[in-house]
Amino acid sequence: MEALTLWLLPWICQCVTVRADSIIHIGAIFEENAAKDDRVFQLAVSDLSLNDDILQSEKITYSIKVIEANNPFQAVQEACDLMTQGILALVTSTGCASANALQSLTDAMHIPHLFVQRNPGGSPRTACHLNPSPDGEAYTLASRPPVRLNDVMLRLVTELRWQKFVMFYDSEYDIRGLQSFLDQASRLGLDVSLQKVDKNISHVFTSLFTTMKTEELNRYRDTLRRAILLLSPQGAHSFINEAVETNLASKDSHWVFVNEEISDPEILDLVHSALGRMTVVRQIFPSAKDNQKCMRNNHRISSLLCDPQEGYLQMLQISNLYLYDSVLMLANAFHRKLEDRKWHSMASLNCIRKSTKPWNGGRSMLDTIKKGHITGLTGVMEFREDSSNPYVQFEILGTTYSETFGKDMRKLATWDSEKGLNGSLQERPMGSRLQGLTLKVVTVLEEPFVMVAENILGQPKRYKGFSIDVLDALAKALGFKYEIYQAPDGRYGHQLHNTSWNGMIGELISKRADLAISAITITPERESVVDFSKRYMDYSVGILIKKPEEKISIFSLFAPFDFAVWACIAAAIPVVGVLIFVLNRIQAVRSQSATQPRPSASATLHSAIWIVYGAFVQQGGESSVNSVAMRIVMGSWWLFTLIVCSSYTANLAAFLTVSRMDNPIRTFQDLSKQLEMSYGTVRDSAVYEYFRAKGTNPLEQDSTFAELWRTISKNGGADNCVSNPSEGIRKAKKGNYAFLWDVAVVEYAALTDDDCSVTVIGNSISSKGYGIALQHGSPYRDLFSQRILELQDTGDLDVLKQKWWPHTGRCDLTSHSSTQTEGKSLKLHSFAGVFCILAIGLLLACLVAALELWWNSNRCHQETPKEDKEVNLEQVHRRINSLMDEDIAHKQISPASIELSALEMGGLAPSQALEPTREYQNTQLSVSTFLPEQSSHGTSRTLSSGPSSNLPLPLSSSATMPSIQCKHRSPNGGLFRQSPVKTPIPMSFQPVPGGVLPEALDTSHGTSI
């Protein structure tokens, strides 16, 4: 800068020395903070004074006054001082306040006034509303075009399709300049917020965290996603840095910096400091051809101002360039005035005197200036009827991403006052924006969505799972990389009492992560603070419980009938037996009175019960039913037996061959009604919040949710709820606990269980889905959603699901969850009861037999041995043969073939020669010959003890009976006794009264006694 000043000094001195001889004298007023305006003005005068083609031999002289910023009174004083010296025109570069005061003065004195509006403190300028002249003659010409930033911003937000954004402005910016923009935005339905930024920007952001609640701070973060900065370049740089350092900015933020004056180095500083996308709107000027870049209207401009390679040009402000062109415009007017020979000499004017008349050449000079048309450093300059320069052009720059240069700026479009927008402001395809980027991913361990893989010591953790496979597929398709880490608290995300969020949702809100992936469900509460992609898997809630143990009962054969039925059957058998016994006794009495043969069976009670039991088990009976009453009883019993046995057989077959899970819990309604099993879910999870919302809703008609929530929330959830899903799964495996959680998670736990001891009861109560959570307003959401839909269409997602949830795994989830329609083979335990009954019967029979043997043995030993009254069988046979008819053939019977049985010989005294007749009244004994060769025509006679029998049976008084051999009981209750074979000996026998022996009843049997 000092070198430039030294270079300009000779020319400045030359201008000052010729001032007295020059007829061209102009005045200039600059503010004290605009040092470059002074230097550029002097440089412009020097260039024009050296150009003989414009002013010929005339030279321009000038007088410069420096005033304080925004001091209208001082500006008027200095202007009056210049007018006293005599000036042809006044060139000023001030703010709007000084410009309004100078406008009134120049209009009154008819001094042409070329006004260049300055940016206040580097902030965007607003239009200066100059006061109209009372007589309608405006001598103030605005060299700098009117502010068109409102038009550019409105077109920009329309192209970007913004519906809600915030505009930040500093104290130097006049907010009244936004009135037209706000009016048009309101008509378009745009939600625009305004916020003033103080000079101490760090204090602004610090106060946000102390004055705002978490919910308000989250909303403020959301507003920063779409922001327009009406700040100075330095202020915008500080503002963005503070936003990034305080985590209020994110990668999806879009900053729009609007300022006519910003240099290329300042733009690069903004781009590299900003997090997210940056759009810059600035004013540009058309560049001339290379061979004419320093030539303007036959005027050669100094290379310091026209050559872009010169560093000084980059240091100039737009007001400096318009100031140079204003001097060039005056020189062009002076040139035409001199050529037309219509020159008006300068006049000394006194502003204080009331009698002072305006300059009479002012109108002519003003008209000459208005008719001028030049092409200077700012392009075309000319003035319209409203005394404004209409030509202005803006450049819109946007950030780009490349692997070579990283983040950079490129030209998106231009805007000019004639054609409007030329180009597109739409964001570049997100795929190219994700290419090469590294995203931070937060996750929570949840099998099988995210699990820790086998890691190598010293290297970062590696993860696997269904969600990781989906993320890898998206990263491969979109070309981005990711760094994954676990949420510090291991939670998905729940809103706390202070309206803040924990877990993965909290990481996204605080901008520490770009996206979150795991078994995270899409809920309305979460969607209010973050964005979600399209669901990549459906979601429902299921019940994880321990499989019911198969109950093995050896007496399952009794299951077809209830205990009451078995009791009635057991009672019916003896009742019917007693009835048959009674009817049989009645029948026996009638048989004796009518000399009819009485029944041979069911004569005793236990025999009657035995017959009834045999009929019940379909084994038949031994009695012949003769009476009608007994036939009715037995017929009814047989019909009863048929129905009972048929029903038992059918029900037993169905009970044993068709197996059904003995699980009383099949739905959430069943779970809420039972009291034996406790149940719960993870505290502060999406499932927990769902049950709370449904259970506490007074409009909910289904009382199931109220019952479920009452149990889940018992003691604040501490009794039945768990802190994480792994704990809930372990608790369910132990039994007597039902874990309510995502079906996908519990199904995987059931499929991979070592003992296959748990099952899942699927009963979807919530139609949601799993998605990828992103920061609110993330530009990547639509891209992720599109790729997920493509994975679904191609079937890649189904392949990944089959990988982690195989249909045929080691554990079968359907074996205890649905009714089996196919029969199965009967196991041994199903018939164990039958074999037990048989074994018990056999053991009981053996025990009874042993008891009978022991009883009979003791009875036989206790009885006194008696003499065996022997009969001389040879005499008996001889007597019988003599009584028989002579026509009937007979043979001698061997004494050894005659067996004396069933005689109660023990009742006879040893000295008795003849047994009394009365003792044989009802013995019904018969004597038969057992000769094999004569069995077809053997003769038998009945030995009657009646008085008509006169058969002499001598009994030997001296013969003694050897020891009796006890065999077994006879049918009539006596004991069979058999004497040893003896030689025929004579024995005495008492004749039977009544004569001869009667004929035997049955001739087919031999003679027996």
Curated annotation (Swiss-Prot):
Tell me the function of this protein: Member of the ionotropic glutamate receptor family, which plays a crucial role in synaptic organization and signal transduction in the central nervous system. Although it shares structural features with ionotropic glutamate receptors, does not bind glutamate as a primary ligand. Instead, forms trans-synaptic adhesion complexes with presynaptic neurexins and cerebellins, regulating NMDA and AMPA receptor activity and influencing synaptic plasticity through signal transduction. In the presence of NRX1B-CBLN1, forms cation-selective channels that are proposed to be gated by glycine and D-serine.
UniProt-annotated binding residues for Ca(2+) 1: E527, V530, D531
Stretches in topological domain Cytoplasmic: 584-637, 852-1009
Lineage top rank: taxon = Eukaryota
Q: What is its main location?
A: membrane
Annotated region Interaction with CBLN1: where?
A: 21-436
Summary of the tissues where the protein is detected: Equally in forebrain and cerebellum.
Subunit structure, per the record? Homodimer. Interacts (via extracellular N-terminal domain) with CBLN1 (via C1q domain), and more weakly with CBLN2; the interactions mediate the trans-synaptic adhesion complexes also with neurexins and are required for ligand-gated cation channel activity.
> Where does the signal sequence lie?
1-20
Membrane topology term:
Multi-pass membrane protein
Cited Pfam families: ANF_receptor, Lig_chan, Lig_chan-Glu_bd
Note down the stretches annotated as region Disordered: 931-960
What is the annotated localization of this protein?
Postsynaptic cell membrane
Q: Name one GO molecular function term.
A: G protein-coupled receptor activity involved in regulation of postsynaptic membrane potential
What's the name of the protein? Answer: Glutamate receptor ionotropic, delta-1
**What InterPro entries is this protein classified in?**
ANF_lig-bd_rcpt (IPR001828), Glu/Gly-bd (IPR019594), Iono_Glu_rcpt_met (IPR001508), Ionotropic_Glu_rcpt (IPR015683), Iontro_rcpt_C (IPR001320), Peripla_BP_I (IPR028082)
UniProt-annotated glycosylation sites, renumbered to this chain: N131, N200, N422, N498
User: Between which residues do disulfide bridges form?
Assistant: C80-C351, C96-C128, C294-C306
Q: What UniProt keywords apply to this chain's record, in alphabetical order?
A: Calcium, Cell membrane, Disulfide bond, Glycoprotein, Ion channel, Ion transport, Ligand-gated ion channel, Membrane, Metal-binding, Postsynaptic cell membrane, Receptor, Signal, Synapse, Transmembrane, Transmembrane helix, Transport
Q: What family does the Swiss-Prot or TrEMBL record give for this protein?
A: Belongs to the glutamate-gated ion channel (TC 1.A.10.1) family. GRID1 subfamily.
Q: State which ranges are Extracellular (membrane side).
A: 21-562, 659-830
Q: Which reaction does it catalyse?
A: Ca(2+)(in) = Ca(2+)(out); Na(+)(in) = Na(+)(out)
- Biased composition (Low complexity) is annotated at 943-958
Residues annotated as binding Ca(2+) 2: D753, D755, S757
Q: Which GO terms describe its cellular component?
A: GABA-ergic synapse; glutamatergic synapse; postsynaptic density membrane; postsynaptic membrane; trans-synaptic protein complex
Q: Which organism is it from?
A: Mus musculus (Mouse)
